[in-house]
Amino acid sequence: MHLSRVLRAVNVLIIVAAVALLAALWWFVYRPGPTTSGDLAAHVSAPVTITRDEYYRPHIKASTLDDALFAQGYVTAQERLWQMDMLRRVAGGELSEIAGRAALELDTNARKLRLGRIADMQANLLPPDQRRALAAFARGVNHFIDTHRDRHSWEFTVMGYQPRPWRIADSLLAILQMDRTLTSSWETDLQKGRLLATGNPDLVRQLFPVHFGPDAVEGSNAFAVAGQHTASGKPLLAGDPHLEFGIPSPWFPIHIQAPGINVAGAAYIGSPGVAIGHNENIAWSVTSLEFDAMDLYTERIDLRSGRYEYKGQVLQATPQRDRIAIKGERGVEALTWITNHGPIFVAEAGQAYSLKWAAAEPQPYGVPILGLNQARNWDEFRSALSSYAGPGFNWIFASRDGHIGYQAAGRLPFRSGFGGDTPLDGPGGEFEWTGLVPFDQLPSVLDPASGLLASANQDPFTKPTPYAINGNFAAPFRSRQIRDLLGSRGKWTAAELLTIQKDVYSGL
């Protein structure tokens, strides 16, 4: 009897301990949850209202655009501050500071790419309207950080640090990281170069690159249907842009309303405005252009002194020294030599390669998202895109006045007479870019006779161009399937277009 009482007492203690542990875990995870009701004191010029719908999407209504973007920064930080901080750390090469030596290689590569330096430089080159928008967003993020010290999400507690203030340059870092993800082709260039050096050149060019096995290939889709094919007689647009898979998503659903703007859709995390979505007059979506924006150059360089050859002369590379902090250890110093083509990024088998990247070019890195958000028609849409200088995208457009359109835009290198899909000879100086491709020389279509537009990462360069075309374009099977489905019938509704987005048939 005594033993059974002891066992019962032990069981009760175990249950109590388990309940207490679960309660502690629940409190630990959910204690920093966003405040979604009540009033908050903030530095805005007039009251701002933030409501959330049944899907928890924030709807912001403000008296000024600055106040609206301040609120966007605040609600984004409420839900995604850890993600934002990781994004800027990955891009800026600062993961080792919180994760230790395991992240050192990632940080070293990011420092070689100079993402942090590029972001700082570009922050000073922004047009006043774009800088003001990014500053308002950053103020909102920082208001959340400042009013929640020691009450941030559990990830910060586990890692044992507090987030530093958000800067304009951090929003640019987030965009640069997306650019890096979408345009990193240097490994492919190296692989193809190795095959060409050891195999049949004609066969390599025919077959490379090859995707082996049944692995899914990531790809984005966007399409527009003119009114002649819809039940309403008005255009319809659908889009599902894909970035790297992750939880949470790199997209943040939001609705922003202020004088001169009423826009809803998905913001790219860490950036103000709506990247893809619609306002009262137009709708738009994007897919990756897949144009090659990186080139590797072979270099004859002394990696001890930084002296290298170019066009028969010996030049001095610029030393870039970075101090990388490592959690629990002394930091390390990383030295990168910067040639006229870019940083020495990789070396193998005694050969050093420099990396030239369109995102690192000195021209302003324009992010005219608010211009897109406020555009009322095709001309204003294209005018906003003409100053866009981020990663290459296919932009699909539809408007309430009955138009559909396509526009390519982004920072694309102007190569004349060479493609750049294998490492180029650096010392000879014969394979140099001549700037970036002008906006008016990029593919553009308004109201095609078919009444259909579809972009699925396929090659959009259907006409001769003065610059070489090179890229990791998708095979045309997805775009062909979309066009075949759209052309198979008429009187489409928005709900019915969803069946095309969910279609899984492969025409390969």
Predicted regions, residues:
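Substrate-recognition/specificity elements adjacent to catalytic centers across diverse enzyme folds
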Residues: N11, A24-P248, G260, G265-I269, ...
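Short helix/loop capping segments that flank catalytic or ligand/cofactor-binding pockets
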Residues: K61, A68-F70, G233-K234, F245-S249, ...
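A conserved hydrophobic secondary-structure block that centers on an alpha-helix together
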Residues: P214-A216, F252-G265, S271, E361-V367, ...
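Hydrophobic alpha-helical segments
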Residues: Q351, G390-R489
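Proteins synthesized as precursors that undergo proteolytic processing into mature forms
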Residues: A359-P362, G366-W395, R400-D401, A468-L508
